[in-house]
Amino acid sequence: MAEYTISQQKIKIGTTSDKVANDALQVQISWIIFNGDASFRRVQPRNPVTFESLNAAGAIQLVTRYSELNLDAKAFTHGLFNPDRSVSRAQDFGVGINWYLNHNIKLQLSYNQTHFTHGAVARFDRPTEKILFSRMQVAF
């Protein structure tokens, strides 16, 4: 699955205003590697965990994502944002594993790295952010 968007906004800070156009994209690829059927609605485990079958396996999915945000250079050159405190580009790459216990419960574990470029003090980039996070999703 992939998305691309362009956002145009008129920004006014104090007496300074300008119209800026930012763009962003996201690409995600996922694979059901064990015991499930994929669809655009929800993953359906072939052997779901229920109260009657607590030793069932559920379904396992691997996911990889890439996303990017590009801010309009006019926002910095016309004084709307401070180039010494902000970056104009962020790129994120992530991998994850999802465990679908059944139709209603999903456990997620993901790792992401975000690289920031084109900005910050004296044009030095901010350090890369790294995050490991987990989530439990209940859908009904």
Predicted segments with their positions:
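Outer-membrane beta-barrel pore domains
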Residues: 1-140
